Regions:
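Charged low-complexity interaction tracts in eukaryotic proteins
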Residues: 3, 18-21, 31-33, 37-102
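Short secondary-structure junctions and interdomain/linker hinges
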Residues: 15-18, 54-58, 122, 141-145
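The alpha-helix within a helix-turn-helix
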Residues: 24
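Glycine-rich, aromatic-bearing surface loops/beta-hairpins
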Residues: 106, 110-162
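Positively charged, polyanion-binding regions of nucleic-acid-associated proteins
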Residues: 1-18, 45, 111-120
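Residues that form generic nucleotide/phosphate-binding pockets
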Residues: 11, 46, 50, 155, ...
Length: 162
């Protein structure tokens, strides 16, 4: 059994943010409820893919209220359309994880910094397809968080005009 980025986001959304271990536990629970097996390597790859596609984003510590052990938490990202998979409806009760408050503005600033870094690398390498994809992400980021990404878009536009 595997999950797409929107299903992973659908498992994270009710909690505000989850650690990778908590998300893995949630996915195992959903797989169990569906009578399916879960491949840990495939799940890790799906989570990595969701992060790469901005469906999930890593929360900087200042963006989430969490008395944890410093473990990175994942939150729903700007390109996600959270869709809990069948069998996920009871996860909040099963996992016993309280909802975490995520500061969207702080999280948005961290996402913008990541986007800027990826933009610089894509432009420097002349990766026009990557630039186009990141341009689309930039619009999603502004709709998702109270941040301004116009400077990044200007760089994308300039690179695509060359």
């Amino acid at each position: 059994m595997s999950f797409d980025g929107d299903e992973l986001a659908g498992m994270v959304d009710p909690f505000g943010a989850l650690s990778r271990a908590e998300l893995s536990e949630a996915a195992r629970e959903v797989a169990f409820r569906r009578g399916d097996d879960l491949d840990d390597a495939a799940l890790a790859a799906a989570v990595d893919g969701a992060v790469a596609a901005y469906r999930l984003v890593v929360c900087p510590p200042e963006a989430v209220r969490f008395d944890g052990d410093g473990t990175d938490l994942l939150a729903v990202g700007p390109t996600a359309f959270p869709e809990p998979p069948e069998g996920a409806e009871d996860l909040p009760h099963i996992l016993g994880v309280d909802r975490r408050s995520v500061d969207r503005e702080r999280l948005g600033r961290a996402v913008v910094e990541r986007l800027r870094g990826q933009a610089a690398r894509a432009v420097d390498r002349g990766e026009h397809e990557q630039v186009r994809q990141l341009l689309d992400v930039s619009y999603d980021v502004e709709a998702w968080a109270p941040v301004d990404v116009s400077d990044v878009r200007e760089r994308f536009d300039s690179a695509l005009e060359e």
